[in-house]
Swiss-Prot record:
Lineage: Bacteria, Pseudomonadati, Campylobacterota, Epsilonproteobacteria, Campylobacterales
Binding site residues for UDP-N-acetyl-alpha-D-glucosamine: 92, 121-125, 307, 329
Paired cysteines (S-S): none
Subcellular location: Cytoplasm
Pathway in which the depicted protein is active: Cell wall biogenesis; peptidoglycan biosynthesis
Organism (species): Campylobacter fetus subsp. fetus (strain 82-40)
Record's keyword annotation contains Transferase: yes
Coiled-coil ranges per UniProt: none
Protein name: UDP-N-acetylglucosamine 1-carboxyvinyltransferase
Amino acid sequence: MDYLEIKGGKKLFGSVYISGAKNAALPLIAMSILAKNDVVIRNIPQVADIKTLIKLLQNLGAVSKFENLDLVINTTTINSTKATYDIVRKMRASILVLGPLLARFGHCEVSLPGGCAIGARPIDLHLSALEKMGANIEIKDGYVIARAKDGLKGANIIFDKITVTGTENIVMAAALARGTTKILNAAKEPEVVQVCQILNDSGIKIEGIGTNELTIYGGGGELLNLNKICVIPDRIEAGTYLCAAAIAGGEITLKQVEPNHLVSVLGKLSDMGVNFELGDKSIKVISDAKLSPVQIITTEFPGFPTDMQAQFMALACVANGVSTIDERLFENRFMHASELNRMGADIKLNGHIATVSGVSLNGADVMATDLRASSALVLAALVANGTTRVHRIYHLDRGYENLEIKLQSLGADIKRLSE
């Protein structure tokens, strides 16, 4: 099994290109189920979660290939609507095929999902919304079995809690439904916005894009002709490299990035004493690694993203003072705290609040527990005294494309080894 060995103390300099967003690419790949043509998706990140979803669609009968780093996928050959456990268990986002499969074929079976073990991330909101659209749903033998004999119909959906994948699932299902679907308390993350914009460009009228209230005028079951798609830049990967420069010190430039998607992250880094120069599609970050403490509350976009919470905990570990992090979106998302404490961090947990007192860190053997926790350990290792080995980095490979190679190019002393 691979692990990363990192020797701390190196400042970072240079430029790094940000990959396409994994969390944007996943629903776009699932959206291909709604199409009658070859769907071309550009800027696809080469990460494990993407490969898992492509494999899932291939198992359903879809045909896909890469042409010059563009994914070309055709789902007109799908001959099965059962997404089996052996694939779905690897990734929670596999549930994104539920809405498109049901909307197109009127029936499907999707295994209950796996992926990061971050507390309770129920799919009840997806299922209750589909039931309002006329679906009959039962859970049997670990599968969601969904039927809509006469097709899905428009409905008024009110999400009790904002859900990104739930919003994406229902928007895609509504695109082929009969009539109009309204979604209240919809997610408005950039990844959701891109899903809506692409459907809108393909002839499905959607109002309220970028707001908490969406209106989708369904196409009545007619398959879509999807235009060429370019995945938006990964705001979480970008945020992670911003944090890398902040904690290690130095001067790096992020290229192929969307600064407007990072306003809350940039604001908190500024509070910690990090300086920036913003371009149209670039961010230069300048840091002396002397960080001030920070107060963070995770919330939905455009607030501070939960997917950056672990990385900022790493920064707080070496800040000059006491920081607090209030995780309000997911339970049990402080699993990285105990591993950071192995490196000498002073983190105290009280429910969903972490209090972090800044200290000096020392290298240690640590274990990744989920995708973003693994990146926090890498960040801490960049500034720790001595050598750190980060184990179970298959979590990291789920969401970061060539992380160690990109960090090496910036001057970090990091290498991938096998146990």
